[in-house]
Amino acid sequence: MTGYFLPPQTSSYTFRFAKVDDSAILSVGGDVAFGCCAQEQPPITSTNFTINGIKPWQGRLPDNIAGTVYMYAGFYCPMKIVYSNAVSWHTLPVSVELPDVTTVSDDFAGHVYSFDDDLTAQLYYP
């Protein structure tokens, strides 16, 4: 999943995967998720993930794996989630804690947007 997170306030935002089965990464930022106006292009090969969770074959990951990113209000910030699952059915619960301590879970309407690659608006790149 790719999109642009629009922070309502200038502050730190904590993204969280409640449970990962089998692997998931979250990348936030222009040099990590995807380049300016390149949401539909091949991925950047950065391994500087905001959250990196890969479950061992014979074990499990801790719950609530989190990563925090500082963002500026009103600037669209690229984000990408890559999720894989093997053997059995599962989902990836995703949430973000806003500066006012409100938690947004799974439905990111009003927070994450998608645009054509010819976007001309200002984007934030940390």
UniProtKB/Swiss-Prot annotation:
Domain PA14: from-to ranges: 1-110
Highest taxon listed in the record's lineage: Eukaryota
Record note on disruption phenotype: Leads to cell death when overexpressing the camptothecin mimetic TOP1-T(722)A mutant.
Pfam families, per the entry: PA14
Disulfide bonds: none
UniProt similarity note: Belongs to the flocculin family.
Protein name (Swiss-Prot/TrEMBL): Topoisomerase I damage affected protein 8
Record organism: Saccharomyces cerevisiae (strain ATCC 204508 / S288c)
